[in-house]
Amino acid sequence: MIIRSPEPEVKILVDRDPVKTSFEAWAKPGHFSRTIAKGPETTTWIWNLHADAHDFDSHTSDLEEISRKIFSAHFGQLSIIFLWLSGMYFHGARFSNYEAWLSDPTHIGPSAQVVWPIVGQEILNGDVGGGFRGIQITSGFFQIWRASGITSELQLYCTAIGALVFAALMLFAGWFHYHKAAPKLAWFQDVESMLNHHLAGLLGLGSLSWAGHQIHVSLPINQFLNAGVDPKEIPLPHELILNRDLLAQLYPSFAEGATPFFTLNWSKYADFLTFRGGLDPVTGGLWLTDTAHHHLAIAILFLIAGHMYRTNWGIGHGLKDILEAHKGPFTGQGHKGLYEILTTSWHAQLALNLAMLGSLTIVVAHHMYAMPPYPYLATDYGTQLSLFTHHMWIGGFLIVGAAAHAAIFMVRDYDPTTRYNDLLDRVLRHRDAIISHLNWACIFLGFHSFGLYIHNDTMSALGRPQDMFSDTAIQLQPVFAQWIQNTHALAPSATAPGATASTSLTWGGSDLVAVGGKVALLPIPLGTADFLVHHIHAFTIHVTVLILLKGVLFARSSRLIPDKANLGFRFPCDGPGRGGTCQVSAWDHVFLGLFWMYNSISVVIFHFSWKMQSDVWGSISDQGVVTHITGGNFAQSSITINGWLRDFLWAQASQVIQSYGSSLSAYGLFFLGAHFVWAFSLMFLFSGRGYWQELIESIVWAHNKLKVAPATQPRALSIVQGRAVGVTHYLLGGIATTWAFFLARIIAVG
């Protein structure tokens, strides 16, 4: 930490009325580009309009103007998010059985959509229990609402209206901070101030206010609900906030007010700030007193973190100093120059943020089932499966986005003349070693992981089960994973004497939590089958990284195309006249990376879905005997490719294939339709531009004959456009197929 004289304070941070509000410009498609604004001559125009509308770099090269457009667009994004949230809460208030579910969450399923009786579609309204007919939802909103202490549909209405107000406010802010008071570039680049505000404000005060809400509103209301009190009898949030005696009846330490806090006698508060570990046996969710404690602790950490950086007062860390001090014995100039990169290239900044947020989203996916945070979430198998799948897909997309923007940074924002011997330059100079080693790792993982399966298929086909890799023949136990599980299972007694259970029941031990006769969570055994599929995960992830990293490291130049940077981020080939140079642009690497990301995530969600149905989810008898949905068949069936096809894909597709004539029939139709969308993508991916141009010209001839030819000349999609349309339908079709398959299955059997 350096103490120096105060830096001169920045006085004027905004420009007033920089861009006049013009409806004429809004009404003109492509007003941001001279070429597009002329209007369409060929059908390529509409594609270019979509490609460039949000590519602010192509509108202007002025960094301040680009920054303002991004900033304004963020408010628009927030507005849409608030609108979406409002819609969710409105559906809960207007069309749902939330109050009925609240009174009996183990026998009544969540529903917030009732289909109108048009041409027989009301068949979709299944019986979710309690006399309510509607579509069963798997978003987890009911569980979140209960955890936050919402007890009536009126409260949901109020929240929905509140979210609408915020949506309007965000729209206004987006307009105001672009047209009326637009921040100067210096404001966007003041990273210390931004860190202080984001850490202390958003994360610190945000967590503190949530912890406050949990303690004063959620905890007491959930106490009442768990005790079986009728939601209509429970005191309202404002009564709990204003009347300390009410809370003191549930949590005696409330009677003492803030005295224990100021006298440092904090253990007094242990009745509502706990450290128990494990799950609440009534709801199958984390102890809400544990999560309140967690948010309070997080708030303290971030409030401290938000006071670490030097702004107008000459005390604290400067980010530039920190980065430039980061030098190792083998890293040359180290992080020198990184500060300039991250304050002038928003693509570089975004790439880092997407990589971290994507990884975090995948971590969230895993925590949602291992440490289910909301009441009655763990026993709602459809929601558990949906939340895992959703967060895995989102994480995958965000990580591919990170590679995309890293490559755009390399092409558009990287200045090789000012970068010498810093970390980035050193990575670029030994990129051949990185990529060739990574390629070797992919080949090794691919052949060995797949080879283990093929061995098992062969032995199985030859009737030699004793020669297979399995828990009952040649064992390949995941010993490191089992060691980690065991360490965590034993941890509470050693590292956290106050805790009664480990962080997650999945680690091991003898604990099993069941709610209403359904398993919430139990220790998850790992064996040979998990060892095999884990190495498939390692393989697919490494291939995805290989493709994406190659795209970034060779975005500016390669031996094949030394001047690649001049061709831009996306180009079809370095031609004409140079064969063998197609599909080398940074954009093409993102395109190819998306397919492998899809492979990676598919294997993960298949593994999760089958493993949970086989070894975790199921019912428990009065004698304590657990019957799993697929009877523990994962360990012996998933060790062959044939087992995956027969006992997972085919066996579990029976529900979606036989859904016609039932309330799940929409999933059957989606299953069919999404397969079609997926197959449609192959038309774009497997045929070239010339084929379609020829066809189009013959169709145009026919139109001319009939004198119905359009003024805008039809053109085949460009190579890049065709691949973009192809990968979009491939992913959309694949994801929707999986969604229909999973939900029809789990709603029918879960």
UniProtKB/Swiss-Prot annotation:
It is an enzyme of class 1 (oxidoreductase). The chain crosses the membrane at residues 70-93, 156-179, 195-219, 291-309, 346-369, 385-411, 433-455, 531-549, 589-610, 664-686, 724-744. GO terms for biological process: photosynthesis. Chlorophyll a binds at M683, Y691. Signal peptide: none annotated. Chlorophyll a' binds at H675. GO terms for molecular function: 4 iron, 4 sulfur cluster binding; chlorophyll binding; electron transfer activity; magnesium ion binding; oxidoreductase activity. InterPro entries: PSI_PsaA, PSI_PsaA/B, PSI_PsaA/B_CS, PSI_PsaA/B_sf. Keywords: 4Fe-4S, Chlorophyll, Chloroplast, Chromophore, Electron transport, Iron, Iron-sulfur, Magnesium, Membrane, Metal-binding, Oxidoreductase, Photosynthesis, Photosystem I, Plastid, Thylakoid, Transmembrane, Transmembrane helix, Transport. [4Fe-4S] cluster binds at C573, C582. The keyword Transit peptide does not apply. Phylloquinone binds at W692. Its main location: plastid. It holds the Pfam family PsaA_PsaB. The PsaA/B heterodimer binds the P700 chlorophyll special pair and subsequent electron acceptors. PSI consists of a core antenna complex that captures photons, and an electron transfer chain that converts photonic excitation into a charge separation. The eukaryotic PSI reaction center is composed of at least 11 subunits. Belongs to the PsaA/PsaB family. This is Photosystem I P700 chlorophyll a apoprotein A1.
